[in-house]
Amino acid sequence: MLDVLTGFAIIFVVIGVGFVLAHRGVIGKGEARLQFNRTAFWAATPALIFSSVATSDTSAFASPVVAVIAAASVATMLLYWLCSRLLFPRSGAETMAGAAAASYYNSVNIGLPIATYVIGDATYVIPALVLQMAVLSPFIIAGLNAQGTSLRSIWSSVVSGVTAPVVLAAVVGFIVSAAQWEVPDVVMKPLEILGGASIPMILMSFGASLKGDGLLEEDR
């Protein structure tokens, strides 16, 4: 129990640091804050995912947990689609947007930190992240762009999801683990250090996003 509380304390403290830094103007708004997310997405998080998967047991990817996550996501999307068709008819794009909102979960900002610091193993959240990025996201984007958009544009959206850095890192890491290859320290150690920056950057950016303009401010 103490380990669980410690894990959540780590998460909330780092989020709090991001909020305080944004409040003091150290982390700027908009594009300035999003640099944290972009750096994490393109460099730190892929490094974390590769180093985690490459040194893990590949059986985790066939865990019942992954099957439950996939089934729950698909079932929720289908349930919303059915309700949208029967109870409150909407256009195809609006239905897809609602289905995405109903079934999508925050596997990066919340999933990775909780899996790492509370559960103690990020391996189980990585298949869920890959499911989102490589399967659900391209499908959702294609559905949103289905009307009035060329097939080439839809295909480009699908390819961008499948070739996202975190997806490629997971696939390469899985191959390394399945083949039981040993990554040299000269490669793995820098990746581990870089990956260690992923969750703090994500959480601080999330904390900074909580420092926004209030709805009831006098100048609004």
Residue ranges and their predicted role:
Residues 1-220:
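Alpha-helical transmembrane segments of multi-pass small-molecule/ion transporters
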